[in-house]
Amino acid sequence: MGRITNKGSQFPSLFRTVPSNKLQALGLARLVIHFAWSWVGLLGEDSEHGEQGVEVVREQILKKSACVAFEDKLPRSPRPENTRRVVKTIAESQARVIVAFCGVEVLPVLEQLYEHGVEGRVWLSSDAMSQIYLLKNQKAFQMLSGSLAVVPHKRNVPGLRDFVLRLHPSSSPEDAFIQEFWSKVFNCWWNTSGGEETNNARYCTGEESLGNGTNAFLSMPGFDLAFNVHNAVYALTHALNNMVQKESRGPKIFGNKTQGFRPWKLLQYLRKVHFKNKAGEEVFFDEHGDLPGLLDIFNVHFQETVWVGRIEFGPSGIKKLEVNNTALLWAGGSPEVSKTIFFLMQSWEKFNPGK
C-alpha cells in the first residue's frame, strides 16, 4: 500500500494515474457526513497505511461533530487474541457504523462476528477490503451485506478485451511472450521444439479459449485497472509529442542525433500535459502529480456489489457526491435506513445530552 498523504510535491518526478489512498479516506469520511452518521467505529490495518487512513477519516468526521465510538487496529497477520479483542469491541459498542481501512486481515473478524450473531452493522470500506468479495466467503458476505465500499473508478480500455481474445500462440509463433502468457493462464506447456514435457506439465492443445466462459483471466483483479496504464502511456505519448513539436526548431532528438534530449525536459512537458482520453475524461496532473480523483461507491447486496454512486474530486477537495438512494440496501436487506438512523440518533443523544 502507498502512503496516505500526498507526497507528490516532495518527489517532482512522480506521477500517479490512480487516485491516492488519501482520497479514499476522504471519500469514506464524506459518506459518514452525507448520511448524518454521528456515532462511528474506526478499524484500521496496523500499518502506516491503516493509521494514516483512520487519521484522515477521524479528522474529517470530528470537524462535523460526529463522534468516534471506538478505534482499533488489526495486524496484517492477525492472531486469535487480536481477532477476539476486535470482535468484543464491535459487539459491545453501540456504534452501528464501522469505517474499515484494512484488507483481508479483517476476514477472521467478520467470520467470528457471524458466528456470534452480531448483526446490523453498516461497514464502510476502502478498496483494500474489496479482495474479500473475491473470496466468496459466505459468512463475510452475510456480515457485509448492506455495506458500502469506496474504490477507484475503473473503466475498460476500448478494444482491449477483443485484442486479448484474439491472442493465440499459433498465430504469433515468434512471440515468446504470448506462449508464456498462454502457459500461465491455462497451466499447460506450449511445446514448439518437439521436446519432451518438463515438470510433468501437460501439453497445451491449442483448443484452449480465453472466452469460453471457463477461464477467469478477463475478470481477474487488476484487468479492469488497465485503463490507468492506458492513461499513463497516453500522457507520456502526449508529453513526448508536445516536446518534439516544441523543440523541433532546436537540436534533433531522434534518429542518431539525440544531443538535444534530456529527461528533465520531458518531465516539464509531462507536468503540463492536458488531453481527453478515449472515455472523454480530461487527463492532467495537479501539483502533487495526481490525476483528478474519481471514486465509485458500491453497495453490497448479499453476494454481489452494485454501483450506487460516485465521488468526484477537484483541486480543493470533494467537488461532487452522487448517491442513488433508491438503489441502496442496508443491513438486513432493507431499502430503509430509518431504524439504523434512529438507533444512531439515540446513541448521539446519550453521547451529547442536551444538544
Name each model-derived stretch.
Residues 1, 10, 18-38, 44-53, ...:
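Extracellular ectodomain signature
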